């Protein structure tokens, strides 16, 4: 008898919700047009929007670049992507890969749940690293 496959209900819901957000974000852009822009067959794009399949990291990255969701929608999409794939979004993975010493610093957080205040402090610190060409902080 074949082994039973456990279906993760939360992951299934997350795929459906992510697909719905992608569909809403594309607005007047057709499913075929979006599929072409991200390099997918239309049928694959349909499976993603229907919540049958989840986008790969590469496809998710392209979708974000094409759809340009507002901040709140992007945050929701990222959380859904993480719930499905169990990894950070591709842009965050790139940042960590480009800053290899960041891995050791982040390991110090293992087992910690940051408070909202601590998250704000970390966000402010990260924002301070963004500078324009004149060296002035970006507001």
Segments and roles (model prediction):
Residues 2-28, 117-121, 125, 132:
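A short, Lys/Arg-rich alpha-helix, primarily the initiator
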Residues 3-4, 75-110:
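Short, charged recognition helix plus adjacent turn
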Residues 21, 44, 58-63, 88, ...:
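A general alpha-helix detector
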Residues 27-47, 77:
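Short alpha-helical DNA-recognition segment
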Residues 39-55, 62-63:
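Recognition helix of helix-turn-helix/homeodomain-like DNA-binding domains
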Residues 56-76, 83:
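DNA major-groove recognition helix of helix-turn-helix/homeodomain DNA-binding modules
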Residues 100-137:
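Short, low-complexity, charged amphipathic interaction modules
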């Amino acid at each position: 008898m074949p082994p039973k496959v456990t279906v993760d209900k939360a992951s299934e819901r997350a795929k459906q919700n992510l697909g719905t957000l992608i569909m809403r974000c594309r607005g007047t852009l057709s499913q075929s047009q979006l599929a072409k822009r991200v390099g997918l067959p239309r049928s694959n794009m349909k499976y993603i929007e229907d919540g049958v399949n989840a986008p790969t990291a590469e496809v998710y990255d392209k979708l974000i670049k094409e759809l340009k969701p507002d901040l709140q929608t992007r945050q929701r999409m990222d959380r859904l992507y993480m719930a499905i794939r169990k990894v950070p979004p591709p842009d965050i993975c790139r940042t960590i890969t480009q800053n290899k010493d960041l891995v050791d610093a982040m390991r110090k957080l293992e087992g910690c749940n940051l408070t909202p205040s601590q998250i704000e402090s970390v966000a402010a610190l990260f924002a301070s690293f963004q500078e324009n060409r004149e060296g002035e902080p970006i507001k």
